[in-house]
């Protein structure tokens, strides 16, 4: 994993842990959504596993993308178009940047 991808993976993990904290209700009671908190924490741990080389970055980012898209589908289906939508937009932006780095490494 390149230094840039490693740094981005760390930032992405922090985004997922931040979202998990928000959905745990610790910061804002209105954000309480336990299933989302658990899923986001697990996805953050998958990214940490990639950082410490327990899993390949490609596999980790594939898992995290699938989980994020699943979460986004729930957000849209429930009409939660405020903070929850923006959290997923930020997550997807981070994932897009990571995939760009992963594919750039592969073709270079």
Regions found by a protein language model. Give the residues of each.
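Juxtamembrane helix-loop boundaries in multi-pass membrane proteins
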Residues: 2-5, 9, 33-38, 64, ...
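A loop-to-helix transmembrane entry motif
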Residues: 23-42, 89
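Hydrophobic alpha-helical transmembrane segments
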Residues: 25-28, 48-55, 74-80, 101-102
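Core segments of alpha-helical transmembrane spans in multipass integral membrane proteins
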Residues: 14-18, 34-53, 62-69
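Membrane-helix boundary elements
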Residues: 2-31
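Membrane-water interface at the C-terminal end of transmembrane alpha helices
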Residues: 2-11, 51-59, 94-108
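Membrane-helix boundary connector in multi-pass membrane proteins
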Residues: 55-90
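N-terminal signal-anchor/start-transfer transmembrane helix
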Residues: 15-26, 46-47, 96-102
């Amino acid at each position: 994993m390149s230094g840039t991808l490693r740094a981005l993976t760390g930032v992405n993990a922090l985004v997922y842990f931040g979202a998990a904290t928000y959905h745990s209700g610790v910061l804002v009671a209105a954000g309480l959504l336990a299933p989302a908190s658990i899923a986001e924490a697990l996805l953050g741990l998958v990214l940490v596993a990639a950082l410490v080389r327990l899993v390949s970055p490609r596999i980790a980012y594939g898992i995290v993308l699938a989980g994020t898209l699943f979460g986004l589908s729930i957000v849209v289906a429930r009409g939660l178009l405020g903070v929850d939508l923006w959290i997923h937009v930020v997550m997807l932006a981070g994932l897009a940047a990571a995939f760009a780095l992963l594919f750039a490494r592969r073709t270079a």
